[in-house]
Amino acid sequence: IEPFVTDRKLFRQRLISAVDYGKSLDGIDASKIAMIGFCFGGLASIELARSGHNLSGCVSFHGLLNQSDETFNKVNTKLLVLNGDLDPMVSSEQILALQNEMTESEADWQLINYGNTYHAFTNPLANDVAMGTVYNHDSDERSWIAMTNFLEEVFGNVNK
């Protein structure tokens, strides 16, 4: 993980390569691609949005929010960030920095900060308050609903 956290250019290149490969596969509608990530994958989802690469949407569940020192492109991808307010891996300064960054990038973004919720709140096996990783049933369900609503918005209702 560390090489990608410290070298965001490399990280974005790898993410873009993976998306471009996925777009090239038979049966894939390249105009309807979203990325969903949890923890480090949540950071990856945010980083892909920051890259300026065109996706329908990116979703981050309890993702790391640490920002790199690099300047980012205009964010063209809708972004949903789902965070626990007691997550020890995300500071209030990081939340504010992300909000400012996304607003300055003219992004279409949402951030939901679930109260009394730690990191890894979607993982039923997480139960370590000392590490700050605790499953939260209500936040898990609410975040899943938020994600499905977001995906319905970016893709349209596929069940109609």
Language model: regions and residue ranges:
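N-terminal cap/leader regions of alpha/beta-hydrolase-fold enzymes
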Residues: 1-160
